[in-house]
């Protein structure tokens, strides 16, 4: 018999529990307390870290969940570290349900089911009252757009973090130049397009390089999302923050 959804503000279910675990683990090191928005289209998070150096824009699509019930917009405040403490026990073949009951609107519930073990675990976590400051992202036309294997990007960032604090990224035609300098060494890596590697969907003219300098500390945090997808999407524009997009498995 189908569950009565009338008692829930939110009730969603996914078999992609591993992707949710990886996502929350990555977010907890960038965001502490943040708002998450549920509505009929999906799950959304737009927030900056405490230093306002990083903007996170996450969207999970309702139609990609096994079931999705959220008849009206619901905004909740959560502590990401506490959420990860509950969800880190999940394994890839678990089924995760996330719910908020009408009679307990100040708690979020996580139900983890494992068919193989015939087990069910339910957590309920207190929600936070966080002011809802809406962040609007204006449309931007980028000068360079590319895809790159996420595992290779992670390795490059890790290697350069051992040398310096910042990475200079320069797009020249169909090549990508990565540089970093430290007290004891420097590194320069030049990447060109390959069938299974770097691929430009929009390239700059060779005489008009597109470049910027970015913090390796934050890029290293981003690479915790590596296992979510095989490719990252990178968007570069002069005098503009670096945009890196990870697909959250098949969810968004």
Show which residues each predicted segment covers.
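DNA polymerase sliding clamps and clamp-related checkpoint/processivity subunits
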Residues: 1-28, 33-162, 168-252
């Amino acid at each position: 018999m189908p569950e009565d959804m009338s008692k829930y503000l939110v009730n969603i279910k996914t078999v992609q529990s591993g992707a949710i675990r990886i996502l929350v683990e990555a977010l907890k090191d960038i965001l502490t307390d943040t708002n998450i928005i549920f509505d009929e289209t999906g799950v959304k998070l737009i927030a900056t870290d405490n230093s306002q150096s990083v903007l996170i824009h996450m969207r999970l699509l309702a139609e990609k969940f096994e079931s999705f019930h959220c008849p009206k917009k619901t905004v909740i405040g959560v502590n990401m570290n506490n959420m990860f403490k509950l969800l880190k026990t999940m394994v890839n073949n678990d089924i995760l349900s996330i719910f908020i009951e009408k009679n307990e609107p100040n708690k979020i519930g996580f139900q983890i089911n494992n068919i193989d073990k015939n087990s069910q675990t339910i957590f309920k976590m207190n929600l936070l009252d966080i002011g809802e400051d809406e962040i609007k992202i204006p449309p931007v036309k980028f000068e360079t757009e590319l895809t790159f294997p996420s595992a290779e990007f992670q390795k490059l960032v890790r290697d350069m973090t051992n040398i310096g604090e910042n990475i200079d990224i320069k797009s020249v035609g169909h090549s990508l130049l990565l540089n970093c300098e430290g007290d004891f060494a420097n590194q320069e890596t030049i990447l060109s397009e390959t069938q299974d590697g770097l691929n430009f969907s929009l390239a700059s003219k060779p005489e008009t390089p597109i470049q910027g300098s970015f913090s390796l500390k934050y890029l290293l945090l981003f690479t915790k999302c590596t296992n979510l997808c095989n490719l990252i999407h990178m968007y570069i524009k002069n005098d503009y923050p670096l945009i890196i997009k990870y697909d959250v498995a098949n969810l968004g």
